[in-house]
Structure formats: C-alpha cells, structure tokens
C-alpha cells in the first residue's frame, strides 16, 4: 500500500510538473519582451546559426504567435481605417509584420548588391523578395501590404493557386503597374505570363526554368517549381523554390542549386530531395502561416528546429520575417 501511495504521489507530482511547464510555455510575453525578440531576430542574429540569443528570441516570438489565432489574422487583414491599422500594429503579430515590411522596404532600397552576391528577404510564409545587382523580384508574395510590395518588385512568380501562396489584390496591383506576373493558372484581372511545364523564360539577365508537380495525391500537377538563375553578375546563383510540391522525384533542377526553398511539412521526403538535388543551402519555409489554425497546419519554430536536427545537411536555414540574407557562394564551403 505504501508503495502504491508513493507511486501515486510521484504521478501527481509529474502531472503537476508537466502542467506547470505547459503554462510557462504558453505564457504570453510582454509587448516590450516581444518587440525586443523581434529586433533580435531581424537585426542581431541569423537563421543559419541558431545561437542561444536566436533561440531565446524565437521562443518569445513563438509564444506570442501561439496567442494569435487565424480569426485575429483575418480581422487584421480586413482593417480599412488607417488609425485603427496603426493602433493594431503597435503590438503583437501585426507589429512584427509591419516592422518586417518596413525593414525590407528600406533595405531593398539601400542595399547595394555587389557582383557575385544575392540579397534575400523572407516576407511571410513562403514569400521571398530577392535583389540581384540588376533586378528585384518576388516569389509567392502573400501580404496585406499590396501597394507597397508591388512598388518594390520588378516581377513576381506564383507557385500555385492556394490563398497562402497567392494574393489577387497584389497580383492585380502588379499588373496595373505593367509588371510581369508568372503563374500556371488564369487570374481574373491580371495580365499574367501563363507558364508551362518544362519551359524557360528570361527577364533581363535572369533565367527561369519551370516544372510542374504534385501538391498531394488529389492535386496532381498543381504546383510550379521555379529554378531561377539570377544571372552572370551573381556568378549565376541558382534558387530553387518548390512551393508546396510534395514529390521529390519531380524535383529535378538542371543546374547546381545554391538555395533550395521548400515547404517543411507537406509530405515531401526532404532528405531524399536533398540527396537528389544536392543543394548548397536549404531554407525551411512555410512556418507561421497565420491563416491556418494554431492546432492545424501552422508549423512553428520548434517544428523547424526538430526537422533541422534530423536532416543530414550542413547548411539548413530557418529564416524569419524581415531577415536579410546576403548570399555569396564563395563565402561558403
């Protein structure tokens, strides 16, 4: 009886400890702590070297993200009044998003991209903005800041027709400015370049090779992968953005890939894809998609860190919103 009682006490203590840990992990940070973490992520650390400082900032930021449901995200996206919008962006996730965009806008304008390099920013989800010595372009831009981003980029690409990868108001704004939009599907009100499977396009000195693959078993030939040669002034740096592609056998770039931008949890055998493609760097993407429920399809920094530890590759990145990455191939072995 004494042994049973002791066991019960131990069990109660364990449950209490787990409960306490859960409460601590879900505790919402103060606005000051959150803003400090955002600054640390965007200005003081990088997604390749997960230092203790970076880890702490990711933990604080994640705690706030965990308190921002998809319903609040939708409400924020629908704010029309400028005063109400400014008020919303003083704190929480809208603050992070506004700070990220302001940083990107300033840095895209002021960053002098040297020959042999490419500047890359993660805007949101799988939406990247890339600046070369000759051009600025976007991939899978999904934002409430339609006009501001449309002014920022020269052309853009869309991997597929899902709402977390495309944004019709943004694409219409691009089209209205006479800027090129690449997509494999028709978009009402957008004068787009209708891309094909196994095709090659050029924009200035940038070469884009497209292939089309599966999203899942039901959505066959649904996602466009973009193999982007950023041009001779970048030493022909190659980006390979595969959107929500989930079949690694369909991911077959022709050139040596510098940066492989992939969905971290779409059913893709990532290690097999890495083994097949042999990229120099891997960007784990599709984290913190706020349109998804917190408990469904919203992958966290913790999820990405666990995946990073499992993968056999020396250069796995976990980029965050607003982070600038200056890539120069010769700086890496």
Task: Give the label of every model feature segment.
Residues 130, 160, 208, 244, ...:
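Divalent metal-coordination and catalytic microenvironments
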Residues 21-29, 194-204, 220, 232, ...:
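Binuclear metal-ion centers of metallo-dependent hydrolases, dominated by the metallo-beta-lactamase
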Residues 1-21:
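Bacterial Sec-dependent N-terminal signal peptides
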Residues 153-157, 179, 189-208, 258, ...:
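Active-site regions of enzymes building and remodeling cell-envelope glycoconjugates
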Residues 20-122, 129-148, 153-155, 166, ...:
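Metallo-beta-lactamase
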Residues 142-145, 214-278:
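Active-site-proximal loop/helix segments of hydrolase catalytic cores
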């Amino acid at each position: 009886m004494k042994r049973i009682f002791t066991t019960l006490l131990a069990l109660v203590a364990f449950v209490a400890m787990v409960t306490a840990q859960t409460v601590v992990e879900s505790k919402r940070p103060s606005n000051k702590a959150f803003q400090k973490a955002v600054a640390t992520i965007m200005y003081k650390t990088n997604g390749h070297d997960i230092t203790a400082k970076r880890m702490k900032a990711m933990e604080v930021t994640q705690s706030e993200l965990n308190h921002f449901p998809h319903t609040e995200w939708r409400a924020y996206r629908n704010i029309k009044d400028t005063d109400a919008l400014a008020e919303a962006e003083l704190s929480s996730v809208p603050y992070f998003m506004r700070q990220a965009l302001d940083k990107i806008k300033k840095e895209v304008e002021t960053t002098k991209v040297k020959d042999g390099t490419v500047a890359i920013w993660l805007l949101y989800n799988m939406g990247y903005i890339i600046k070369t010595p000759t051009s600025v372009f976007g991939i899978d831009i999904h934002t409430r800041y339609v006009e501001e981003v449309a002014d920022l980029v020269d052309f853009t690409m869309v991997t597929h027709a899902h709402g977390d990868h495309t944004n019709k108001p943004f694409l219409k704004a691009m089209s209205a400015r006479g800027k090129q939009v690449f997509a494999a599907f028709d978009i009402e009100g957008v004068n787009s370049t209708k891309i094909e499977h196994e095709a090659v396009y050029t924009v200035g000195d940038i070469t884009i090779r497209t292939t089309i693959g599966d999203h899942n078993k039901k959505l066959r030939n649904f996602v466009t992968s973009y193999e982007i040669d950023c041009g001779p002034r970048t030493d022909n740096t190659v980006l390979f953005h595969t959107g929500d592609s989930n079949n690694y056998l369909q991911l077959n770039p022709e050139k040596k890939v510098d940066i492989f931008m992939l969905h971290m949890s779409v059913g893709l055998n990532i290690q097999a894809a890495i083994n097949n493609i042999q990229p120099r760097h891997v960007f784990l993407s599709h984290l913190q998609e706020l349109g998804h429920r917190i408990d469904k399809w919203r992958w966290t920094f913790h999820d990405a860190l666990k995946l990073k530890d499992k993968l056999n590759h020396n250069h796995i990145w976990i980029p965050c919103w607003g982070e600038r990455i200056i890539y120069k191939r010769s700086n890496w072995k």
